[in-house]
UniProtKB/Swiss-Prot annotation:
SUPFAM superfamilies found in the cross-reference section: DHS-like NAD/FAD-binding domain, Thiamin diphosphate-binding fold (THDP-binding)
Molecular-function GO term, any one: 2-succinyl-5-enolpyruvyl-6-hydroxy-3-cyclohexene-1-carboxylic-acid synthase activity
E.C. code: 2.2.1.9
CDD domains: TPP_PYR_MenD (cd07037), TPP_SHCHC_synthase (cd02009)
Entry protein name: 2-succinyl-5-enolpyruvyl-6-hydroxy-3-cyclohexene-1-carboxylate synthase
Keyword Transferase: yes
Function: Catalyzes the thiamine diphosphate-dependent decarboxylation of 2-oxoglutarate and the subsequent addition of the resulting succinic semialdehyde-thiamine pyrophosphate anion to isochorismate to yield 2-succinyl-5-enolpyruvyl-6-hydroxy-3-cyclohexene-1-carboxylate (SEPHCHC).
Alphabetized InterPro entries for the sequence: DHS-like_NAD/FAD-binding_dom, MenaQ_synth_MenD, MenD_middle, THDP-binding, Thiamin_PyroP_enz_TPP-bd_dom, TPP_enzyme_TPP-bd
Catalytic reaction list: isochorismate + 2-oxoglutarate + H(+) = 5-enolpyruvoyl-6-hydroxy-2-succinyl-cyclohex-3-ene-1-carboxylate + CO2
UniProt xrefs under NCBIfam families: menD (TIGR00173)
Cofactor: Mg(2+); Mn(2+); thiamine diphosphate
């Protein structure tokens, strides 16, 4: 049946604390009404008028101070909810509005009771999401609806409580096959929970008695590094430090910097499995780390975020804590005395780091060694380094090691695009601190006009450009070797960056070797103006050298 995935959605909302559901009769919403009613645990109410139904649900939520489900069919039905939704938003009353909808193939073709219900209530809801039917063979067929329910519930109870819209396109047959066992499918072994602020103190015993792993992503919170280092020391937990977390500025025994390389080893992945995982900030860039997290599907996954934002694409989060990092870290008072799990990570880290350091002997032009050279020349400076997306942030993830330093690494990892890098770097440069942009050729071409403002306002920036003549990242991905690979993905352009530098008024230098890079970098970082240091590399050679230096041997 096309709508059986909704049974876990109904079950999850009840597990989270929803107890009431209000319906208005309709055909497209048949499955929702029947599944809520058949569940037998909800107090359900039917109101023939959608406007009245919405205010009725508002009254229940207002009295009980908890979210109430409000269901309507497709078409104009949702429009009748609007007055109550505006009241709920301004009064901060939590409602979860489920708008049944026609599927995509019936949109914009004159189908009856059909209009565009995307973000139908505009700014009057805290959150909007489409709950599409997952592919039947998808691994997350039963878990995905539960995660949508969790996001809806948390958004309704955010710091400013309010209504949430979940739009649900439904296909025929509309009458569901009612199987009681479907309600239980996709349930986590560890039921989803959420906590606020000081409630996190209840984690003391659970975290101290388990193999705990800390994931540190990009985060702008004050005292972020200090708080996580303190927490790691209490828990004896390794910190997998994304370069944008800036925890690699601390040569701490708790900080791991080479995990993306050694997590390619299957034996290690099994041996390093965690029982509790703590996520702070954005999910780290490492794809292998995300694959490792998915393997730990029986671990307690605790996400700590002041806004209750959902930042785990592996869909394994079991606990969300609404707290800043410092408050959570300070709530863990006891000290773990067991170093065994930490020592396993330290052993793998040390072995992998020794292998990665061998790149210092490489004489061919290779991004890995140039990153290490860049770190060496930046170490003594109170500098800022913006890293572009695609391969450059991954090069930093692999090759930037932990050491005591003041270099602040930044990146646009919100939506991970390759545009706007020069403009962002020049905005960062307005602080007056030494500023460096590490970018690739395609990223730089996307924002050449951004250099104009740097000339206009006489800003200082050193650009380190890895030019491999096209999309080098695709040589590391599944597209490598497909028909028309160069034309469709690698996209060699053959452009002359010296000419582009002359056009935009940059001070230009083509780097000839590693020693030349060091000399030119030391000069440019101390001189005013915008400087471009171009490093030409070969995509195929870089791929071969990457495999050579990142291989973890048992």
């Amino acid at each position: 049946m096309t709508n059986e995935y909704l049974a876990p959605f109904v079950d999850e909302l009840f597990n989270l604390g929803v107890r009431e559901a209000v319906f208005s009769p309709g055909s497209r919403s048949t499955a929702l009404a029947m599944l809520f009613e058949e569940y037998k645990k909800y107090d359900t109410y039917v109101n023939i008028d959608e406007r009245s139904a919405a205010f009725f649900a508002l009254g229940i939520a207002k009295a009980n101070r908890r979210p109430v489900v409000l269901v309507c069919t497709s078409g104009s039905a949702a429009a009748h909810h609007f007055p109550a939704i505006t009241e709920a938003k301004t009064s901060r009353i939590p409602l979860i509005i489920l708008t049944a909808d026609r599927p995509a193939e019936l949109q914009f073709v004159g189908a009856p009771q059909t209009l565009d219900q995307t973000r139908f209530f505009g700014n009057f809801v805290n959150h909007f999401e489409n709950l599409e039917a997952p592919q039947p063979q998808a691994k997350n067929f039963w878990t995905y609806p539960r995660k949508v329910a969790q996001r809806a519930f948390l958004s309704a109870l955010d710091q400013m409580a309010g209504p949430v819209q979940i739009n649900i396109p439904l296909r025929d047959p509309l009458v569901p096959e009612l199987k009681s066992e479907n309600y239980e499918k996709g349930r986590s072994k560890l039921p989803f929970k959420f906590f606020k602020g000081q409630q996190s103190a209840s984690f003391d015993e659970a975290l101290l008695s388990s193999k705990t792993l800390i994931l540190a992503g990009a985060n702008s919170s004050e005292n972020y590094s200090e708080s996580l280092l303190k927490l790691a020391e209490h828990l004896k937990a390794p910190i997998l430090a994304d370069p944008l977390s800036n925890l690699r500025n601390h040569n701490s025994p708790f900080v791991m910097d080479s995990y993306d390389a050694f997590l390619a080893n299957d034996d290690l992945k099994t041996d390093l499995k965690a029982e509790s995982i703590l996520l702070f900030g954005q999910m780290p860039v490492s794809k292998r780390l995300q694959q490792f997290i998915a393997l730990n599907d029986d671990a307690e996954f605790i996400q700590v975020d002041p806004a209750l934002a959902y930042r785990n694409p592996s869909l394994t989060t079991t606990i969300t804590v609404q707290s800043n990092v410092a408050t959570f870290a300070n709530s863990i008072q006891k000290v773990n005395q067991d170093f065994s799990y930490l020592e396993k990570w330290q052993k793998a880290q040390e072995k992998m780091r020794h292998q990665l350091e061998k790149v210092a002997q490489e004489e061919n032009p290779f991004e890995g060694r140039f990153v290490q050279e860049l770190q060496k020349h930046l170490k003594a400076l109170d500098a800022q380094l913006l890293v572009s997306n695609s391969m450059e942030i991954r090069d930093i993830d692999y090759w930037w090691k932990k050491e005591d330093s003041k270099v602040r690494i930044l990146g646009n990892r919100g939506v991970n695009g390759i545009d706007g890098t020069e403009s962002t770097a020049l905005g960062i440069a307005t602080t007056g601190k030494p500023t460096v942009l590490l970018t690739g050729d395609l990223s730089m071409l996307h924002d050449l006009n951004g250099l104009i403002i740097g000339k206009t306002h006489e800003l200082n920036l050193t650009i380190v450009l890895f030019n491999n003549d096209g999309g080098g990242i695709f040589h590391h991905l599944a597209q490598k070797g497909v028909p028309n690979f160069d034309y469709l993905f690698s996209t060699p352009h053959g452009l002359n960056f010296e000419g582009l530098a002359e056009l935009t008024g940059l001070d230009y230098h083509l780097v000839s070797n590693y020693a030349d890079f060091g000399q030119q970098f030391e000069t440019s970082i101390r001189q005013p103006g915008i400087h471009l240091l171009e490093i030409k590399t070969d995509k195929d050679l870089s791929l071969a050298l990457h495999k050579k230096y990142t291989a973890y041997e048992n």
